[in-house]
Amino acid sequence: MAGTEHSGPEAGFADVFRGRWCILTPPPGTDETAVKKMAELWRLAGSQVDVMDPEHHDKVLAVTSHLPHLIAYCIVGTANDLEEHLKGEVIKFAAGGFRDFTRIAASDPIMWRDVFLNNREAVLEMLGRFTEDLTALQRAIRWGEGDKLQEVFTRTRAIRRGIIDAKQA
């Protein structure tokens, strides 16, 4: 679980795997010695290693990696599809939040097309859950439910800080 929005050999750097997770997903019946050798190889590259069932891996990555990329691509597309006078101002006034949030939309589109199509079921499941949560926030905004918004924002802020404390972001 490493890298940047850049791709290709020129985007590589020596410490790309240092401290980052590598998830091995051996199919049933895989020789345990082979799994241990692969884990050691990744540890030598600087990674932390975990082993997961492939289906579980797909769900975890759908929400932690694939969905954020999909949303970043979508919001950039939405901003680009605005009326001309708004589009110019979106570009002009795009501040740190928009740039930070959409950085990953600069990622390799061919790779991400393949990721989404090869992980279709897990992505669609997590996208459905996200859509439900987004709809709940939309409803809270529509009905002026400030307490609901604050509760969600406070809870998710604490979760985000935990991710930072775990040095995963």
Could you describe each region identified by the protein language model?
Residues 1-10:
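Rossmann-like NAD(P)(H) cofactor-binding subdomain of soluble oxidoreductases
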Residues 158-169:
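Long, positively charged, glycine-interspersed low-complexity recognition regions
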Residues 16-103:
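Internal alpha-helical scaffold of NAD(P)-dependent oxidoreductase catalytic cores
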Residues 10-16, 114:
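Short, flexible, solvent-exposed loop/turn segments with mixed acidic/basic and small polar residues
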Residues 87-155:
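Interdomain hinge/lid region at the active-site interface
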Residues 1-2, 56, 108:
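Residue-level detector of flexible, active-site-proximal loop/helix-junction positions
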